[in-house]
Curated annotation (Swiss-Prot):
It comes from Rhodopseudomonas palustris (strain ATCC BAA-98 / CGA009). Belongs to the GrpE family. Residues 1-40 are annotated as: Disordered. This is Protein GrpE. Keywords: Chaperone, Cytoplasm, Stress response. It is found in: Cytoplasm. Signal peptide: none annotated. Its main location: cytoplasm. Pfam families: GrpE. One of its GO terms (biological process) is protein folding. Participates actively in the response to hyperosmotic and heat shock by preventing the aggregation of stress-denatured proteins, in association with DnaK and GrpE. It is the nucleotide exchange factor for DnaK and may function as a thermosensor. Unfolded proteins bind initially to DnaJ; upon interaction with the DnaJ-bound protein, DnaK hydrolyzes its bound ATP, resulting in the formation of a stable complex. GrpE releases ADP from DnaK; ATP binding to DnaK triggers the release of the substrate protein, thus completing the reaction cycle. GO terms for molecular function: adenyl-nucleotide exchange factor activity; protein homodimerization activity; protein-folding chaperone binding; unfolded protein binding. The gene is grpE. Gene3D superfamilies: 3.90.20.20, Head domain of nucleotide exchange factor GrpE.
Length: 207
């Protein structure tokens, strides 16, 4: 190949290159390392905040549960003991009920002092129970409430509304807002329907 031929080839290559269209590649922005780091920090902060809120909620629930358990232990911790003591209160009441009213009125000084001593003992016992949240209630004259009373029998009595407690065989007791022992009662049968009751009866030391 002569020099002239080589020059021709170079000229042809140059012309062909000029005729070919130029294809440019799209420009891709490089990732900003600082921006990615900021996003990661935001996610970590959100996760940490979420964990902190959950932990605070769990701690608050634990605090409330602990307070309730402590309060229940304080209120109901004497339940078993109080239930055993109720037998003593019942026996004192039976002893007083066994003495008729006329016998009390005409009792000799010795017997009268004995009766007064039993009454004083019963009052002291009920006061001690009440200081520990245990209260006696007598629902006589109120509408029967199965949440506080246990019906032992029915008494035909059209003079009072049906469902009225007309006799109390055994007084009931509550401890806190729970029934320690329901009252054993006799309920009237017949008469008009009794009005709604608001609970188990008046609470307190009822002699």
């Amino acid at each position: 190949m002569t020099e002239t031929d080589g020059q021709k080839d170079n000229n042809q290559d140059t012309a062909q290159a000029a005729a070919d269209p130029v294809v440019s590649k799209p420009y891709i922005m490089p990732d900003d390392p600082e921006e990615g780091s900021n996003e990661a920090l935001v996610r970590e902060a959100a996760d940490a905040r979420d964990k902190m809120l959950r932990t605070l909620a769990e701690m608050e629930n634990l605090r409330k549960r602990t307070q309730k358990e402590v309060a229940d232990a304080r209120t109901y911790g004497v339940t078993s003991f109080a239930r055993d003591v109720l037998d003593i209160a019942d026996n004192l009441q039976r002893a007083l009920d066994a003495v008729p009213a006329d016998a009390r009125a005409n009792a000799e000084p010795g017997l009268k002092a004995l009766i007064e001593g039993v009454e004083l003992t019963e009052r002291s016992l009920l006061n001690a129970l009440e200081k520990n949240g245990v209260k006696k209630f007598d629902p006589k004259g109120q509408k029967f409430d199965p949440n506080f009373q246990q019906a032992m029998y029915e008494v035909p009595d059209p003079s009072v509304p049906a469902g009225t407690v007309v006799q109390v065989v055994q007084a009931g007791f509550t401890i806190g807002d729970r029934v320690l022992r329901p009252a054993l009662v006799g309920v009237a049968k017949g008469g008009a329907k009794a009005a709604p009751s608001d609970g188990g009866g008046e609470t307190g030391n009822l002699n």
